[in-house]
Amino acid sequence: MNNNLSNIKKGKYFLDKHNCIGLPTETVYGLAANAYSNKAVLKIFKLKNRPRNNPLIVHYHSLEMLKKDCIVNKNFLKLYNKFCPGPLTLILKLKKSSKVSKFVTNKKNTLAIRFPSHPTAIKLLKILKYPLAAPSANISSRLSPVTKKHVEEEFGKKIKYVIEGGNSKIGLESTICLLYTSPSPRDGSE
């Protein structure tokens, strides 16, 4: 696994220019883009052939950054302290002042968020000034990729860069948890 700083900076370079990149996480590789950029987020939908009414998960590295976009409550903090970082996606209320692209949420007032535990994803998120919209790096309805090679085979030259991060350890998408309803919208790795 080669997650040295030059590879991470190269990923940042493409993200800053509103491009999509492949990003390793502990669950599966993600197709990542600046969650604050309409232009970048729309590229995710096009590349994945994903319906725009299917909201995206946004990855954060810190609670402070998350609080700029979402309303945080006691129930969230309990789950955050127990399971984050890790393969759990939580759905929170979006703040009206949030910069998250309306295309990420399909104009809804909620946002699916998670804190990945993969060291490469964490290092990249820490040097960005924005969170990453990052659903699985596959064409919608196909198997989710667990290696850099899988992402490259899926998208070829349609994406600018894939950061090497070794095999995803879990190989299954994160569990999604709504904090104000049940059952879970999607069961996953936790």
Predicted regions, residues:
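Active-site-adjacent structural elements in enzyme catalytic cores
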Residues: M1-S182, R186
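N-terminal low-complexity segments that are often proline-rich with Ser/Thr-Pro
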Residues: G188-E190
